[in-house]
């Protein structure tokens, strides 16, 4: 638990993932997004500041950390759920962001988890994700 708190503290002011920035630059009309494994909220905050309504999901409660970066108008576009991937419930969305989070799903549950992701994304919409790699 101490390591995860340190991670959130170290990443709370990090710039959004470059893929999310690139997505925003495509000038797609802001709609509903899910930030799956949102951590300290860098992508959530960026999406909201660019007009998106975001449901952020993480196994740790980082709601207050993220909320502190949003003004009163932006906070209305923010929702937060504490959920493990094995118990996840995903609502329909136009964009699902899952940067560095998918590998944390139990391999025994992965197929069901992936189907939930696939079923949640509305037709002709976008999944933005990044996995780990070795340099």
Spans of features found by a protein language model:
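A short glycine-rich, Lys/Arg-flanked "PGG" loop and its adjoining helix->strand segment in the class I
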Residues: 111-123
């Amino acid at each position: 638990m101490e390591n995860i708190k340190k991670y959130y503290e170290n990443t709370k002011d990090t710039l959004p993932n470059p893929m999310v920035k690139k997505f925003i630059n495509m000038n797609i009309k802001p709609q509903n997004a899910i930030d799956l494994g949102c951590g300290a909220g860098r992508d959530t905050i960026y999406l909201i500041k660019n007009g998106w309504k975001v449901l952020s999901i993480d196994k740790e409660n980082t709601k207050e950390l993220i909320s502190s970066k949003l003004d009163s108008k932006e906070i209305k576009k923010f929702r937060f759920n504490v959920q493990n991937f094995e118990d996840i419930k995903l609502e329909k969305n136009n964009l699902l962001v899952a940067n560095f989070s998918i590998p944390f799903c139990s391999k025994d549950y992965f197929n069901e988890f992936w189907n939930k992701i696939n079923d949640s994304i509305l037709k002709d919409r976008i999944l933005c994700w990044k996995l780990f790699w070795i340099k």
